[in-house]
Amino acid sequence: DNKFSKAHTRGQPLYATEEVMLSKFRLQPPGTLLDESGLKALGRHGVRQGPAGWTWKFDWHGLTFPYGSVWPQLPDIAIDALIVRGEHSLILPRPALEQVAAGLPRGRALEIAGAHHHVSLDKPRELAEAVAAYAAGLPE
């Protein structure tokens, strides 16, 4: 059981107004360098108005899908892979980042200094530059 397990048995949440809906918006996990106006703008992109009220654009039930361990499958992923973590990520500790990268035949680990879990929100320029540099070094 996880905190989203009840989502599987109930319908997509509905809210009367966009403002009420946005008051519920939170990053999961918490932690970001994005300011309040940036978070609000991000939230606005994640909601939609339907005939019965305001709801999230994503399928609520997707949070409840079970998944197994990926560790045994890593050696079979034979593509170049850049695994990125924010320095302050609450989800992907540095040892796990290194373990994932080491488990991939062509994996490389990269940590973006100062970023939380949502690296693309916290350090978009640094992330884009790192991905571009990584891609430039790949064989054609």
Which stretches of residues belong to each language-model region?
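Glycosyltransferase donor-binding loop in the core domain
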Residues: P13, S89, H116-V119
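Hydrophobic "lid"/C-terminal helical patch
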Residues: F25, L127, V131, A135
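Acidic/histidine metal-binding catalytic segments
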Residues: G31-H45
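Conserved serine/cysteine hydrolase catalytic core
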Residues: V47-G103, R108-E111
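Residue-level signal for the nucleotide or nucleotide-sugar donor/cofactor binding architecture
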Residues: A16, L92, D122
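An amphipathic alpha-helix signature
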Residues: E18-R26
